[in-house]
């Protein structure tokens, strides 16, 4: 609690003669601030230590010190774990039990400046505690609301409230607990049945709209990029048949079964892929020319992107 004793270094020393002597010595030290920097003499250091001890004694002996200590502990308890909270409460009880004494500042009115400081600092700590507590309260309220919404969506019961009138019943209501449980079960069953009927009714009423939305979504999806898995399967086939990347109709059927695409999408993908990333080698061109010029009698047909070449 050292920070509670050093919070007001400017407190005036009212009361006993010892305090006045210490204050005069401290003022003498403050008055010599313009002297060249050098280590203070031992007497000045002792006087400053005595002044600090006197300030601590005045704060600890003030009638408002228990309130100041309680406000400080309340600030430290915000967000603290249970074991730390218990320890802080014990410290607070000890401080309230041992606070107050026959020191120089033991009565209100002897030192108005100290009285004003103690009152002001208590108010500051109380406002600070409110600011610290507000985020925790907002977070707890948000979590409670989310829990209630999830429970309502899942068909479960809402979280229990803290209302003591609802949680605690009288002895006259105890004999009827079985009837109350049966009534609650019946109400819960009827509410679930009503929810199921409502879902069925909405599904029947809007099933056509849902089907149209699904078909429109699939159309838009087809117009966009192909799925990643489908493109991977097509690229695997492309890399395997890179020398002649012209899938047959059987290949297209197999690829359609693997990717879930229709043959038109597969055909368009291969056309675009060949235009962008494939160019036949010189040997392939020579073989194609031989097939065109000398292979007409065999009845074969060569397929290209722009059409067909054959008999």
Swiss-Prot record:
Region (Disordered): 1-45, 153-184
UniProt GO MF annotations: DNA binding; DNA-binding transcription factor activity, RNA polymerase II-specific
Primary location: nucleus
Pfam families noted in UniProt: ELK, Homeobox_KN, KNOX1, KNOX2
CDD domains according to UniProt: homeodomain
Entry keyword annotation includes DNA-binding: yes
SMART domains noted in UniProt: ELK, HOX, KNOX1, KNOX2
Origin superkingdom: Eukaryota
Bias-annotated ranges (Gly residues): 12-22
SUPFAM superfamilies on file: Homeodomain-like
Residue spans binding DNA: 218-281
InterPro entries linked: ELK_dom, HD, Homeobox_CS, Homeodomain-like_sf, KN_HD, KNOX1, KNOX2, TALE_homeobox
Compartment list: Nucleus
Domain (ELK): residue spans on this chain: 197-217
GO CC terms: nucleus
Swiss-Prot/TrEMBL keywords: DNA-binding, Homeobox, Nucleus
Family as reported in the entry's similarity comment: Belongs to the TALE/KNOX homeobox family.
Purpose of the protein: Probable transcription factor that may be involved in shoot formation during embryogenesis.
PANTHER family the record matches: HOMEOBOX PROTEIN TRANSCRIPTION FACTORS
Protein's UniProt name: Homeobox protein knotted-1-like 10
Organism: Oryza sativa subsp. indica
Gene name in the database record: OSH71
């Amino acid at each position: 609690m050292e920070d509670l004793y050093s919070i007001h270094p400017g407190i005036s020393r009212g009361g006993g003669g010892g305090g006045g002597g210490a204050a005069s010595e401290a003022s003498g030290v403050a008055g010599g601030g313009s002297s060249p920097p050098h280590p203070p003499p031992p007497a000045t250091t002792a006087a400053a230590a005595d002044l600090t001890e006197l300030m601590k004694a005045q704060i600890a002996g003030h009638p408002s010190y228990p309130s100041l200590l309680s406000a400080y502990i309340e600030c430290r308890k915000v967000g603290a774990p249970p074991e730390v909270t218990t320890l802080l409460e014990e410290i607070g009880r000890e401080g309230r039990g041992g606070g107050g004494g026959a020191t120089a500042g033991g009565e209100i009115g002897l030192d108005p400046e100290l009285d004003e400081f103690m009152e002001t600092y208590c108010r500051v700590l109380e406002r600070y505690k409110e600011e610290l507590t507000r985020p925790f309260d907002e977070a707890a309220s948000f979590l409670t609301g989310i829990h209630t919404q999830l429970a309502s969506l899942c068909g479960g019961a809402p979280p229990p409230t803290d209302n003591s009138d609802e949680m605690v019943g009288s002895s006259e209501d105890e004999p009827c607990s079985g009837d109350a449980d049966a009534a609650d079960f019946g109400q819960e069953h009827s509410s679930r049945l009503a929810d199921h009927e409502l879902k069925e009714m909405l599904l029947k009423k809007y099933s056509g709209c849902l089907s149209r939305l699904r078909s429109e979504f699939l159309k838009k999806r087809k117009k966009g990029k192909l799925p990643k898995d489908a493109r991977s399967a097509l690229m695997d086939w492309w890399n395997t048949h890179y020398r002649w990347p012209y899938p047959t109709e059987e290949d297209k059927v197999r690829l359609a079964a693997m990717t879930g695409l229709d043959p038109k999408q597969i055909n368009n993908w291969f056309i675009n892929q060949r235009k962008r990333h494939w160019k036949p080698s010189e040997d392939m061109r020579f073989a194609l020319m031989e097939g065109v010029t000398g292979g007409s009698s065999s009845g074969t047909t060569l397929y290209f992107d722009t059409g067909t070449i054959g008999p």
